[in-house]
Structure formats: structure tokens, C-alpha cells
Amino acid sequence: MGLRDPGAKRACPTFAGRKRHVVKIDTNTFKFGFLNPQVRLYGYHQIRLVIRYGNIGRSTRLGRLLGKLSAAECDALDLELNKLRANESLDPQESELVLGRVLEPLFGIEGYEVEHTGGLNDQGIDFRASRTADETSSAPAETIGVQAKFYRKTVSRVGMADLQKLIGAALLQDLTRVVLVSNGEFPREAHAAVEKSLPLRIELLDIGGMRAWISRLREEKVDVEAEVRIMLRDLSSGLARLIAKSPDALDHLEWRMVEQVVAEVFEGLGFAVTLTPGSKDGGKDVILTCTVRGKLAEYYVEIKHWRSSTKVGSAAVEKLLKIIVEEKKDGGLFLSTYGFTSNAFEQLTTIAKHKLKFGDQEKIVTFCQTYVKAKAGLWSPPENLTEVLFA
């Protein structure tokens, strides 16, 4: 690697690409994964790893923006922590590299870049997590020092001398916040010491504390179905408002979207609404429920929105009427955006005409306009909601 002057600071070429690189310095071997690190030499035996966040985690970038880690990321970090248990055989340098892989995403959530400063001349700080001021964020610029203290014995206590060394190193390096990470136990006097009034903030983290940190950042499982329902409802509400203002908007909607808009409109007018499935709906698209004279009443709404501008004929009308009668419902409403044929109602009796009402595009627009007024507080539902349905 061409080391010329052991005492001089000399930059080493950046390792580009995504291949695995192995760099040997003296007797130590450092393996670099797929993080595209930049490597610089600061003396004969010491290296510093600067880990850049822009090259990793593309698949979970949304979660990072929301301040969360995916379940897969958290599980991977838990596995790394298992390697740091006191009965493992890692040497101090290997333990630091494992810890670095854990710290990287945890600090990255808050916009920090993690720099590994460990080695023979680490000056008491193994990692520096730095965040620069950003115009797009209110987070202040800050550098946090992290010192690792790992043991191979199953039961080990972190000595007060280690804590005092960390405080001294932090003050010498003008750090205002430091973290001591260990797989050992922190004695009571250590916790008492960090709670005292000091010119810097000190945090003590054992393996359990690290796991708790990961758990807090775990992205909760999203109820996708509920999210979709909310989005569709918001879309339906927006389309209803658009139709109320510009009726021609109906010409640009598919039949299922019109059904969803009508369902949203009737719910906004005070009905309890059930939108039936897109297929095998049993001959009705929307089921409306309301109270009439103290009794529960149920009505079927069928909607025809054919992009071919086809009008509804008598067969479809008779089919809906038959379903209403056979299922003993209180009535129904047939909406057709392009109207009905001239003979669509010829076979209907007076009773049937009373039980089943009809409406075209103008009727749908009127419903949407009433919906907008209701949402603005300019319209209140009548005591008998069927007046809205059959007006």
C-alpha cells in the first residue's frame, strides 16, 4: 500500500465499486463489505473508516425518512449484538467493527455519519458520530463520542476508571456528549456519577440498552388494508366535490370509482353505508341503512356507468326490483349516468314505482352538491332520510 512516512498523514485512494476489499496493515486485517467506505491513513498502524450513509439502505429509505428501521434491519442488528455477548471469542478490534455495524444505522436515523476512530492511538474514543447543520432540518450540528468496553468473561463489571478515562478524553476533544457501550455490568456508582452535574452528557449502554434502542426504532407493521381504505375514501370525497362543481368529471371515471363516490356521498348525507364487492355483488352496488319512524330501514342502490354511453333497459330494472321484493327490503334507487331507455319502466306497476326510484347523471350531481354543503355545515339531514333518497 506504499506507506512512506510513518509519522505523516497521507490519504489513501477511496475504495470505489461494490466489491469486497481486504486491506492488510501490519498484522491486522480489516474487511470492508458493501458500504463503499473511504479509507484514510493517519499514521503507520492506524486507519479510520468513514461510513457514508448515501450508499446504503435504498430499499428502506422511506422507513429511514420516518425515523424507523424495518423489521429485517432490526433482526439483523440483533444478530450482530449476539456476537458481542461476554462469552464470545471476538478480540477487541473485531468487537469494535461489529459495534460499528450496529451504530451505523442507529445514528443514521438521526442524520449522523459514524467514523471509526479506534486503534492503537484512539485517544479514548472509538467512534465519532457527527451531524452537520442542515437548512432542511431543525436538528443542530453535533458530534457524539462512543467508547466500547467489551469483556470475554461472563460476569464483568465496568470499572470506574474506564468511565473517568472517557470523561477525560471527551473534555480533551471538546465533546459535549459521549456514550460508553459495554457487554459488562455498570455498577451503581457509575450510574450515580453520570447523573451528577457535569460539563458533558454521558450515557451508559449495556447490551440490553442497545436492544431497547433498536426496539424503539423498529418500524411497526402497517395495516395496509386500512391505509388503502383511508386513501380511497379521501379520493372519493375529492371526486364528489369535483363532480359537484364539474359534472363532466363523471365521464372520466371508471364504474367502480363511481360506486365508491356514491357510497361516500350517501355516508356523508347520514346513511349507514355498505359498498358491495366489485363482482358477485348480488345485484346491488350499495346498501343504505337508516331509521324511519323508529324502525331500521334498508335500501339497495344499483349504479350503471357504462363508458359506451349505453342507457339502461327494462331487463336491468326488473332484475333490481325482483331482488328488492325477494329480499324484503324497504326500497331501492337505480342510478344510471346515461339515463334509461324509453321502455325501461313500461312493466312497472304503481306499487313498484313507489318502491323503486330512478336517477340519471343530474341526480348524482345533485347528491354530490348536497354532500359538499353537508361537509361545509350548510345542510343538515332531515328527520326522515328517505326524503333525500326519493326526492
Curated annotation (Swiss-Prot):
GO terms for molecular function: DNA binding; restriction endodeoxyribonuclease activity. GO terms for biological process: DNA restriction-modification system. The keyword RNA-binding does not apply. The keyword Endoplasmic reticulum does not apply. Keywords: Plasmid. It comes from the Bacteria. InterPro entries: Restrct_endonuc-II-like (IPR011335), Restrct_endonuc_IV_Mrr (IPR007560), tRNA_endonuc-like_dom_sf (IPR011856), Type_IV_Methyl-Rstrct_Enzyme (IPR052906). PANTHER family: MRR RESTRICTION SYSTEM PROTEIN, TYPE IV METHYL-DIRECTED RESTRICTION ENZYME ECOKMRR. This is Uncharacterized protein y4cE. It comes from Sinorhizobium fredii (strain NBRC 101917 / NGR234).
